[in-house]
Amino acid sequence: MREGDSGYFSCYDGNRFRLVILASQRAHELSSGACTAVARKGDKNTVVALREIVGEQLDLAAVFRLAVNRCRKYLEEFTNAREVAAARSSQAAPKSAPGQEIGKSFREKDPSAAAFLDQEQFFSGGGE
């Protein structure tokens, strides 16, 4: 920030992280088609959001609540996706006794296919 710019954000009590959250949420809204409260002047959404915040053109409590709700929704989707993936992998994996191998190597599954090209031939570029 330039020297004279620090006065613009004095209403945030030095909490620049809250400012970033607010500007991010507002920029997201602008990207989704929300109307601007200030003239755009060819600026990108993030700059417009910061100008709206500095100009006190927004209900910051409402913007912050929207940001929190967006984060909650993302976390719920992320958690649900991980739970679904874990459930799928546990259903696909065969149950085995402790200490017992779950799968067999490629050579044990199909010896004829493993003889096609062994490891040394593969790494040397041979095989013919």
UniProtKB/Swiss-Prot annotation:
Its EC number is 2.7.7.6. One of its GO terms (biological process) is DNA-templated transcription. Residues 87-106 are annotated as: Disordered. Keywords: DNA-directed RNA polymerase, Nucleotidyltransferase, Transcription, Transferase. InterPro entries: DNA-dir_RNA_pol_omega, Pol_omega/Rpo6/RPB6, RPB6/omega-like_sf. Coiled coil: none annotated. Promotes RNA polymerase assembly. Latches the N- and C-terminal regions of the beta' subunit thereby facilitating its interaction with the beta and alpha subunits. The RNAP catalytic core consists of 2 alpha, 1 beta, 1 beta' and 1 omega subunit. When a sigma factor is associated with the core the holoenzyme is formed, which can initiate transcription. Belongs to the RNA polymerase subunit omega family. This is DNA-directed RNA polymerase subunit omega.
